Amino acid sequence: MTHQRHRREVVARLLRARRIGTQEELLEALRAGGIEATQATLSRDLAQLGARRVSRPEGGTVYELPAGAAERDGLATLRGLVSEVASNASLVVIRTHPGSAPAIARAIDLAGLPDVLGTIAGDDTIFVAPAGELRARKLATRLADLLGAPVAGEGPAQ
């Protein structure tokens, strides 16, 4: 896992676990966990995660992750169970360890990814139908990144 990905996962966990209202509070929490970051880096991380500040009824604001963020993080917990992600012009195929496909397909469905129309899972293979006119190759690359798996013909995912 890259340092950037690890930091973003920690930021997401902190935002789900605590009421954090400022980037300074978040920087302090990261530093307490041994992670150094600049305000500019943290700002980019928050934007990448889709975090936004929302007003609280009792006053003040807190950072909040968009709906589905926890489910997308759930996909990351399934890393290591996916062997490969491949695609053709209209379909993405995910190859998994035996018995893992149903759980991974369910996690993809629960993640609420707007690029995914739906999934069908067997024992070790998942068919993923892209939504709309999205090219299957782009979706394959995105799923491979979320699941930490290589895209067929491209080598290991970063």
UniProtKB/Swiss-Prot annotation:
Disulfide bond entries: none
Family membership: Belongs to the ArgR family.
Signal peptide location: none
Protein keywords: Amino-acid biosynthesis, Arginine biosynthesis, Cytoplasm, DNA-binding, Repressor, Transcription, Transcription regulation
Any coiled-coil regions, as ranges: none
Annotated GO biological process: L-arginine biosynthetic process; protein complex oligomerization; regulation of arginine biosynthetic process
Protein's recorded name: Arginine repressor
Pathway named in the protein's UniProt entry: Amino-acid biosynthesis; L-arginine biosynthesis [regulation]
Known role: Regulates arginine biosynthesis genes.
Any one GO cellular component localisation term in the record: cytoplasm
Gene Ontology MF terms: arginine binding; DNA binding; DNA-binding transcription factor activity
Organism, as annotated: Anaeromyxobacter sp. (strain Fw109-5)
Main location: cytoplasm
Compartments in which it is found: Cytoplasm
Cross-referenced SUPFAM superfamilies: C-terminal domain of arginine repressor, Winged helix' DNA-binding domain
Recorded superkingdom: Bacteria
